[in-house]
């Protein structure tokens, strides 16, 4: 069944009416979905979408004028000069038209308000672009100069939204297969102002299943043996979750189902061609899948390339004329499209954009809606929305069914795949995604593609130009090209009053907030680029003529920036572009919110079974989508005004808005203080205020004269909240009147939403309390929390639970007569319970998430991924079939892990040798569960919990810094955390044991080290005695070497080569020509040094007399030390042996190093005179003094 048959079956009445309209060439309603331009030759714009009954339609718009504007001087000679410039560059144009417009930058008085422009018309976009580039390089100001997407300019100029109903008039009509083709001119298109009929555009949701013979790996399209073996597709009306038709295309036999049509293909090539064929039969307007832009589309395209059928597949799916392969890959296969998820995060998408169908990845949409979501799987998003889950079918079972070709089991795979596709549409409808994006497109004159794949800034910019170019907004000429030097720096910071930290249990605190501060400032002070005055002389001249100006000044990059904005004084004609647009958006949103409230009240009165409920629900969703779109634009407005890459950017305006915000918050602050109110905290657009004590005198006295029971105290708190609400309502009205008198408008207003009591401020933008909105409510389970990191992305349940316990305990109402534990006591009590009673925690309490970003220097994640890579390689080397449990996530994808405990190890000096790096302790959740690995609870406490707990107590006097510390909050936080670390160490039994063990290691090593130094001194004195005989230094060297060998190996010679070398030394002692041979011997000594050391080290047990004495002495010292201290930890025999070997080895190395140094001296002499005694003694002392025994360096 194709699209036309489905439409006729589902909408017979509307289809008959549309057929009649087509027969008589009467006006038709058309809903555009996808936009394509013909940019070569004569410009044409193709819009694809549906007629009101659901027929697929293509609207070709011809005879669209191609032009841009350039500002010139007033006399005609400049026009002639412009013509000559274009002719000199061989730029062909059709004609020139003169018009007047208002430049967007800089204030112009009424008589000079408009400037002359020339509109240059072209036959093609190529010549237009060439002219824009040339004239911009020549220094001319241009307008209407879009160079990337000309259709946006067409939409603005015609006031023709690209995402709402359009009426087609005077069209040429040609039916061709499933597509109804229309040809029109711009004059034949009329924007339909009413809401229009129900949209019957078609969405195709699909999913693919892939297979790899290498078990445990993710199928890779670049691997020849990895295949796509199933594609399931389901189509819907755009607003519905009821399927219109379903198809399953498979390479394995599959039992037929009444729920879908089954197509069995003999090969992957045929499967892909069948997919394209079915796609063309349904001709969907939107194609959607879950994560399909990162997996499904790349897989389909790559496999089509391998089978050499991509051109055929594309041309079957496309409604455009046939394209060659190179054109498809260049123009229609979007390989890397960066989609913005949040301010900090973007994601790369890849998809095949066939003309007539808009691709949309549901996962990207959901991530934009939930930018802080811990999990981004289909199952997780369905759970968040309360929707039915997907089918549970593990991949290894699916692959087994495919391998066995069991038709019954393959039907289960098909059902799994079909339901995945169904859930994509469920999510789109639940979140009203497409209507929301459409409303954004209507406001900004952009396409649905723009609304999905571009950030908000360019849409705000496009909307501003659409407002500006029309007469009612002043006919302002706007460029889309950013000009001038783009400086980077910080604008004036917000006005901040440091919080009075700590727990407030006696007086309610109320937040007073500016409503939409930055948009309100723009409206109040007429901040707009065409109202800006740059020079003081011009400002003085305007003020002399009676104009009212708002002065702004601030420091930016070490210089003073100043300017003036001509104020509107509530006269509509004097309002700038920015205020006019914001006021229009505000008025529209206010009206929609009122309508939404009425619709909501109606919904509550009508049961779901009522015939009109669905229509009411649809209307409610549409109105809500419109008001949300308006809110988005109002909130994004200042962001674009302050964006230095925007063509509208003006530094004095961007900084002027923030500095005016500072001024007004200070103004309100002083007003409130003078009224006798207290300030607990203030920041950017809000103040947290306490009422005067006198307000509560009467109710407090009543309590003091009562029996002071807990019920009486609760009544007191209840009355305090009510009194605060009443007082703040009065104060708010007084503040707004004061602001109106100051700025002369009513746009800048403050409001209060809740009273907080009790409340606790822990830092800037960090506080919590019990919120009382309309009536008092002392429920500690519903806390008002701002900035406290218990809900931070990646945070564990452990941290959230401990933080919540502390806050809930601190919010309990306690009478002044009772013991009110300070916050530090509450924190320690909760911490002690968390550390001592470990059994209360489950495995899930420790699960964390992080994002894998290969290009980001997140050391812990980088170390962990490096370990997982090494583990996978090791498994492959040993022939393991499955390594997927250690697979690397996709870049940007979040993964779950836990921190596991590693065995505590020390070196002989008492330094811990086990790793403390987070990356070495991380393990995937599945691996930790499978192997029952112990969780390192202390790591979580120290690294995640204590920082949060320190935030609660850092206001204590003992943590406060001295007066000369600049960042006092950071200092206090660090001290508080250190205090809590010591507290945890004192109550954690394992931590105390580890510390004790380390102390024993360190102190034992200290004793041995001292003994070694003594014996080295004795041994060095022996060498000094031998070297004192300076009459024959070579003979002294030989004697000292022979002594060393004799002393350490009386029974056996060290080795033959060393014996031979010593004999050669003795034979050549009196030969003045022996230097050359001595150099050879020295070289041999370097080669043999390791052998000598190793031989002596291996014979350590046979060293007698002096070394025996040393060994016995050290053993005695260690034993005495341990007995004295009576420590529970015992030094193992292995440690003692290492200590003793360390002692032996260093005695040997001293001798060798001294010998080497003196050979250097002897070889460096130019004659046979021996070195002086002083020089030799100094050298020995230096050599012995530089030796620092290190067990780790030697043993490793």
From Swiss-Prot:
Keywords: DNA replication, DNA-binding, DNA-directed DNA polymerase, Nucleotidyltransferase, Transferase, Viral DNA replication. Gene3D superfamilies: DNA polymerase family B, C-terminal domain (1.10.132.60), Helix hairpin bin (1.10.287.690), Palm domain of DNA polymerase (3.90.1600.10), Ribonuclease H-like superfamily/Ribonuclease H (3.30.420.10). InterPro entries: DNA-dir_DNA_pol_B, DNA-dir_DNA_pol_B_CS, DNA-dir_DNA_pol_B_exonuc, DNA-dir_DNA_pol_B_multi_dom, DNA/RNA_pol_sf, DNA_pol_B_thumb, DNA_pol_palm_dom_sf, DNA_pol_type-B. It catalyses: DNA(n) + a 2'-deoxyribonucleoside 5'-triphosphate = DNA(n+1) + diphosphate. Disulfide bonds: none annotated. Induction: Expressed in the early phase of the viral replicative cycle. GO terms for molecular function: DNA binding; DNA-directed DNA polymerase activity; nucleotide binding. One of its GO terms (biological process) is DNA-templated DNA replication. Its EC number is 2.7.7.7. It is an enzyme of class 2 (transferase). Belongs to the DNA polymerase type-B family. DNA-directed DNA polymerase involved in viral DNA replication. Consistent with its intracellular location, ASFV encodes its own replicative DNA polymerase and three base excision repair enzymes: a class II AP endonuclease, the repair polymerase Pol X, and an ATP-dependent DNA ligase. This is DNA polymerase beta. It comes from African swine fever virus (isolate Pig/Kenya/KEN-50/1950) (ASFV). The lineage of its organism: Viruses, Varidnaviria, Bamfordvirae, Nucleocytoviricota, Pokkesviricetes.
